[in-house]
Amino acid sequence: MTPASAFHFASLVWDWPIAIYLFLIGISAGLVTLAILLRRFHPEAGGSDSTLLRTTLVLGPGAIIFGLLILVFHLTRPWTFWKLMFHYSFTSVMSMGVMLFQLYMVVLVLWLAKIFEKEVIALQQRWLPRLEIVQKVLALITPFHRALETLMLVLAVLLGAYTGFLLSALKSYPFLNNPILPALFLFSGISSGAAVALIAMALRHRSNPHSTEARFVHRMETPVVWLEIFLLAAFFIGLALGDDGKMRALAAALGGGFWSWWFWLGVVGLGLIIPLLLKLWANRSVTFHGVLAVCGASLTGVLLLRFFILYAGQLTVA
């Protein structure tokens, strides 16, 4: 299989824009999850001045919006997407996802608005002084903010897992029809969120890339990476022990060829082994270059994993 044919083959239905969409959704869910955990375990570090919270403020909703725009314009008839926003089907994974996105965005906006309440009120008084309902809504949220935050955490976890459910629902592809995918996508999304957050912290505090906030994310990142490795192993073991279709799918993905090299060199080599090796140097480094190297490799590995799962998963049809 040549590089050209690896991205264009007869059984391919979902191509590269979907991989980027899945990647962006994972970043949003990962950032929100880490931000809430930071506020729970280190309340003093989870205020509006937190780099993690500020990054979440921009990329939490931003990645979702950009990802959905990619998805909409990738549709054959993008102008019909609005129908999915109002016509729900509890038997459709896509429709359930739209419902989840809508609820996620509403709760996310309210949660972030309360955290950045002073900034929101200052902007409202400057640009929309007559829109007093903003302050009233923020005041109403106050007694329920912790419950809202708990709901936000649940929705972030569901969204991170949903990207895996979306692919695992494709029953005609043995590689993708795997119950491990939701958990794998959830933890790899948290890993990508951690990488983005650490890059933001390193760029903002170049003289001290190992702040309390950064150390918390590092502590969360390490077990997440090992869980990701375990889930990858479980994913392939499940294929190896499966029926004829799953064994054919495994052989097509890892039995040599373009996508096999993509996985071993890109996902495993660049995305897992190199960050683990570089982390030893980064932990001793007093500059931000070590953090950028580790997180850049890890983030690239997560993106390559999305491409591998999507394309290699469509090589074999049941």
Question: Across the structure, where does each feature detected by a protein language model lie?
Answer:
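Peri-membrane helix termini and adjoining interfacial loops of integral membrane proteins
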Residues: 1-3, 76-83, 241-249
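Long, contiguous internal "core" modules enriched in hydrophobic/ aromatic residues
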Residues: 22-27, 41-44, 107-286
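Extramembrane terminal tails and long inter-domain/linker segments of multi-pass membrane proteins
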Residues: 1-12, 47, 86-88, 119-142, ...
